[in-house]
Curated annotation (Swiss-Prot):
Catalysis: reaction(s): di-trans,octa-cis-undecaprenyl diphospho-N-acetyl-alpha-D-muramoyl-L-alanyl-D-glutamyl-meso-2,6-diaminopimeloyl-D-alanyl-D-alanine + UDP-N-acetyl-alpha-D-glucosamine = di-trans,octa-cis-undecaprenyl diphospho-[N-acetyl-alpha-D-glucosaminyl-(1->4)]-N-acetyl-alpha-D-muramoyl-L-alanyl-D-glutamyl-meso-2,6-diaminopimeloyl-D-alanyl-D-alanine + UDP + H(+)
Protein name (database record): UDP-N-acetylglucosamine--N-acetylmuramyl-(pentapeptide) pyrophosphoryl-undecaprenol N-acetylglucosamine transferase
GO function term, MF aspect, one: undecaprenyldiphospho-muramoylpentapeptide beta-N-acetylglucosaminyltransferase activity
Organism per entry: Chlorobium luteolum (strain DSM 273 / BCRC 81028 / 2530) (Pelodictyon luteolum)
Family: Belongs to the glycosyltransferase 28 family. MurG subfamily.
GO CC annotations on file: plasma membrane
Lineage: Bacteria, Pseudomonadati, Chlorobiota, Chlorobiia, Chlorobiales
GO biological process, one term: regulation of cell shape
Protein's job: Cell wall formation. Catalyzes the transfer of a GlcNAc subunit on undecaprenyl-pyrophosphoryl-MurNAc-pentapeptide (lipid intermediate I) to form undecaprenyl-pyrophosphoryl-MurNAc-(pentapeptide)GlcNAc (lipid intermediate II).
Length: 365
């Protein structure tokens, strides 16, 4: 059995594919797994590190906006897409995958389209409440489309073969909070806030935390992943302390989640899947420039039933926003209620279900 995953650019598009690949290895010994991605995406480093083959497809994304520069750039993108489609078709002919699985990002479009034109079976896994352009266009020819949020189905022209499956996410061992806090050298009795901004960081969140760092670490622990882009700047202004851990990237995310009573982060689909699977209450700050404003759709899917609070990016300038986070961190009863609601939205078996569907498609004749 040969399965090709197409997706990446950010962790939100890559990690669901990685979770499905890991489950396929467990369920089908000897399965051949490879990934198509770009040299500039997170997959360029992560996929080889995880031991999978990576096929590089040069592709650029469309620029948003109506300016002349955006128009000229997009003309070039469309020209480049033809070359990307040709490269993707050559890859499909060479690898002869039984199923091509698309998880979003720029690279998924030429690879999925090439597979469909060459008669290969395709499955699309859509992480967001508002589906990306590739999903909306190519779902029509896909054998199956699996969505993480019920809201996503309303944006698809395809109606048959669409399933509400949830997002496959990284799995973490269940650990007691005291063990997680011990891993960061923290006082195990203090409430703990975990802050991160996705694989690239989040400047607005980082600036808000930096402005209110004294309040955030007064009577509580703080685990703060700044992202690589901001770490150098923040490192010059902040030193780790007894109840502060700061770094560009958290290697031991399992301990970080275990330690946390509350999580402050962007509303990326992979993060939301991890939060709900682990029953973690959260404060979600949607990235305001996300394609189709999909992060706001994601955040509302959790804030509506009470599993999370949603704060707009611009509201982080207001001191009351961080004061609200601090108050929530110390409200144990409300945190428990939010965690229970998060658990009701979880899909811990998503990776196994999707792997099963991929296997079924691969074995069809």
């Amino acid at each position: 059995m040969n399965i090709l995953f197409a997706g990446g650019g950010t962790g939100g598009h890559l990690y669901p594919a990685v979770a499905m690949a890991a489950m396929l290895k467990e369920m089908v010994p000897g399965v051949e797994l490879s990934f198509a991605g770009t040299a500039s995406g997170i997959e360029a480093g992560e996929v080889p590190r995880l031991g999978y083959r990576l096929h590089l497809i040069p592709v650029r994304g469309l620029k948003r906006g109506r300016s002349l520069s955006a128009l000229l750039s997009n003309i070039g993108v469309l020209t480049d897409f033809a070359a990307s489609l040709f490269r993707a078709a050559a890859l499909i002919r060479r690898e002869r995958p039984d199923v091509v699985v698309g998880t979003g990002g720029f690279v998924s479009a030429p690879v999925l389209l090439a597979a469909q034109l060459l008669g290969r079976k395709t499955l699309i896994q859509e992480q967001n409440a508002f589906p990306g352009l590739t999903t909306r266009l190519l779902s029509i020819l896909a054998r199956e489309v699996h969505v993480a949020f019920r809201e996503a189905t309303g944006y698809l022209m395809k109606k048959r073969g669409v399933f509400l499956t949830g997002n496959p996410a990284r799995s973490f061992p269940q650990r007691d909070s005291s063990i997680g806090r011990e891993a960061f050298g923290f006082d195990p009795l203090l409430p703990t806030l975990l802050v991160f901004g996705g694989s690239r960081g989040a400047r607005a969140i980082n600036n808000a935390v930096l402005r209110h760092l004294g309040r955030l670490t007064a009577g509580s622990n703080l685990i703060w992943q700044t992202g690589a882009l901001d770490f150098g700047r923040i490192e010059k202004e902040v030193s780790p302390g007894r109840n502060l851990w700061i770094g560009a990237y958290i290697e031991d995310m399992g301990s970080a989640y275990a330690a946390a009573d509350l999580v402050l982060c962007r509303a990326g689909a992979s993060s939301i899947a991890e939060l709900t699977n682990l029953r973690k209450p959260s404060v979600l700050v949607p990235y305001p420039h996300a394609t189709g404003d999909h992060q706001r759709h994601n955040a509302r899917a959790l804030s509506g039933p009470g599993a999370a609070l949603m704060i707009e990016d611009r509201e982080l300038e207001n001191p009351e926003a961080i004061e609200g986070v601090i108050a929530l961190l110390h409200d144990r009863e409300r945190l428990q209620m939010m965690g229970a609601e998060a658990g009701r939205l979880s899909a811990p078996e998503a990776a196994r279900i999707l792997a099963g569907r991929i296997i079924d498609l691969a074995e069809e004749h």
